[in-house]
């Protein structure tokens, strides 16, 4: 029986018909304790999901659907290393990377031992650099760490580093290079001293074109200063699942950190892919980062579905995507330090859930995934919230706020006030009675107020979740990221798709090689469609290679 034919799914269709014409204002008016009932705390996070177009029966039916999809079994597979891809290879065992309680998994004990060995190696390097004992080619201590990677090899470490800057030990600084455009590289190193700069090359296969090209630029940049190749070897580290390729590139074996094949890039910040972060904030704080994620893992694994934060977050997303036909979801963090979080979550959701084939190879017959995007509040309020408030689409929003940015900072009350004000407005709207009252109180005549009111109405009934943490620290950040990882995994289970591959992006890479040859006037263009051929010829014309 397919997902859409299951009894809970059919019941959800009827529930949608019942609720689609109702307004959330009425839910709150009829239930004064709705905000209390539809909220929970776990792993240092407070989650309010009361501003959603659901009642308790909806939640029950969504949970029944999850059970019908064997979610309990699939959760245990996630934590036991029993998930495999179409080739039978283990995937999705990233939860082992933050197993901090010295507990041995029932299977894959070798993997756990390798992880613990990696922890020790990361810890030792972190201490050496932070204490100034790791030297460059002129015997000066390292001050700048440049992470070269792309996708998950860059988005995760950069996001986490920016979020945890108050925990970075001066004078250490981290920088991140990912783009093939050489502007990214040269603008990053422009103010750096090659004598005190360490490059971390992160690539699972060590064949990623963008990463290797930037690594080559780093080699040339260091050689201009050091003059001798043997002098720059201490300025390179590699994180990869292909250590032999890293060694062939010129990285010393002792400077190569393992990234296992069963760790996907977008789930790799917990591994040595987070080496730059571990060095910057120190091993103890990095371990707190892992502990926070592990706390969310434990909650996800143990809590009942209707009290399970990742599961509820996933089920609500499915509710809007598959029944309200929402095409997009927004993430709005109210903290400058989380400026890269929307980009990180965009990749996590869209690479994982952008699939149209089920696990058995058959076609998917229901919508999967959505466009996930966002920006910082309050900036976003002056940018695109207008579409949320007075547009015509249903756009679910996740608001994320911290009461304090760090132990030393003041309470973020103005930010919290704006965050809560946006969520309330999205829910209740601004009806004509309220608009008219406020306009008349401003001294505007009734007739003019009638005309103005039409343009100021806000329909409301737009759903949102609010996630609040007391403080933005390594533990809370780890918990938050694990929350969204598990949310995405639950969605993939219910949709019966593989969240751990991204084959779609490979075809474009392959075609880029052929197109580059054509742009270099080395091949004919008969294999390209007329549009691509025309574009190639236009570029060649501008270059002067064509009349």
UniProtKB/Swiss-Prot annotation:
Residues of the active site: 351, 382, 509
Protein name, entry field: Glucose-6-phosphate isomerase
Family: Belongs to the GPI family.
Keyword Cell cycle appears in the UniProt entry: no
Single GO cellular component term: cytosol
Source organism superkingdom: Bacteria
Protein location: Cytoplasm
InterPro entries named among the record's database cross-references: G6P_Isomerase, G6P_Isomerase_C, Phosphoglucose_isomerase_CS, SIS_dom_sf, SIS_PGI_1, SIS_PGI_2
Known role: Catalyzes the reversible isomerization of glucose-6-phosphate to fructose-6-phosphate.
Source species: Coxiella burnetii (strain CbuG_Q212) (Coxiella burnetii (strain Q212))
Annotated keywords: Cytoplasm, Gluconeogenesis, Glycolysis, Isomerase
Reactions this protein catalyses: alpha-D-glucose 6-phosphate = beta-D-fructose 6-phosphate
Gene3D superfamilies on file: 1.10.1390.10, Glucose-6-phosphate isomerase like protein, domain 1
GO MF annotations in UniProt: carbohydrate derivative binding; glucose-6-phosphate isomerase activity; monosaccharide binding
Pathway where it operates: Carbohydrate biosynthesis; gluconeogenesis; Carbohydrate degradation; glycolysis; D-glyceraldehyde 3-phosphate and glycerone phosphate from D-glucose: step 2/4
Entry EC no(s): 5.3.1.9
NCBIfam families the record matches: PRK00179.1
GO biological process: gluconeogenesis; glucose 6-phosphate metabolic process; glycolytic process
Main location: cytoplasm
